[in-house]
Amino acid sequence: MKASLLNKLDTLQDRFEELTALLGDAEVISDQARFRAYSREYSEVEPVIGAYKEWRKVQDDLEGAQALLKDADPDMREMAVEEVREAKEQLVGLESQLQRMLLPKDPNDGRNVFLEIRAGTGGDEAAIFSGDLFRMYSRYAERRGWRLEILSENEGEHGGYKEIIARVEGDSVYGKLKFESGAHRVQRVPETESQGRIHTSACTVAVLPEPDEQVAIEINPADLRVDTYRASGAGGQHVNKTDSAIRITHLPTGIVVECQEERSQHKNRARAMSWLSAKLNDMQTSAAQNAIASERKLLVGSGDRSERIRTYNYPQGRVTDHRINLTLYSLDDILAGGVDAVIEPLLAEYQADQLAALGD
């Protein structure tokens, strides 16, 4: 193992011992915020230290077996040869595991997200495809045990959505969905197409991590214009008879967020403010760290076809992610919620890039 990695692991070992002592300290235990922070860090470091201890044990076993290679007894030497081979195999696997564990963690990976899907070029067909994408992510959320709630929706005239915004809550939501941001292109024959010609449409997807209270941007109330209006209801006994829907405009940036799904104006306002904070945080982060653009491959733009990150070709049953030249002929499975077929190779490619940088 490289000396630089060993140094990192030794430093982490010292930190682990320090955290163990801190979590047993009465002063820390009485401070819930500090105790939670140290507990979170401890849970992240513990598996790394466990793997490092195993690596050191196998390293000791290897050295012991290598010493036996000089034994006068041929049976002992034969046994030592086998032990050396097994130890070397184990070390390769453990070193690879430790390298992955030492990769820089995205602090947002564990966060909930705001999922924004908007129809781009293609008119009615783009809106219909927005609906298809939303169903795909909804089914994916179900598979992962996540909770998805719609905050705002603007339906298309012939189905689907011109725009739909949802909040997704669960385990490692942003970590899984962060590379879904970008323009998604669809190629298919619309139901209204009598000549059987394939049309191309596009939608944009934005995935914004929901900031927690510690990192949320402080918003000056004077910078906000808050409008209330009557949410569109389905009629009957549940029709919304009060102005519970909220529209908030952030005057300095022109960002507008709306939330109309809750019957309580207070809840809609809280959701809208959280979403606004996420959008402002994303804007600030993108401006400060343009390097993020290279990780996300392509930031969300106008929804124009030229900005595509992924193509869904219905006649061929094909999905192609253009960032990693991945082509899969399992369109139906992916649209049914099997998005991991695309997400996992993307994450693996990103991890490979990180490992290459770690090696440098």
From Swiss-Prot:
Positions bearing N5-methylglutamine: Q237
Domain of life where this protein originates: Bacteria
GO cellular component, one term: cytoplasm
Pfam short name (any one): PCRF
Recorded GO MF terms: translation release factor activity, codon specific
Record PTM text: Methylated by PrmC. Methylation increases the termination efficiency of RF1.
Subcellular location, record wording: Cytoplasm
Gene3D superfamilies in the record: 3.30.160.20, 3.30.70.1660, 6.10.140.1950
Alphabetical keyword list: Cytoplasm, Methylation, Protein biosynthesis
Chief site of localization: cytoplasm
Family according to the record: Belongs to the prokaryotic/mitochondrial release factor family.
NCBIfam families on file: prfA (TIGR00019), PRK00591.1 (NF001859)
General function of this protein: Peptide chain release factor 1 directs the termination of translation in response to the peptide chain termination codons UAG and UAA.
Record protein name field: Peptide chain release factor 1
Source organism: Pseudomonas putida (strain W619)
Taxonomic lineage: Bacteria, Pseudomonadati, Pseudomonadota, Gammaproteobacteria, Pseudomonadales
Gene assigned in the entry: prfA
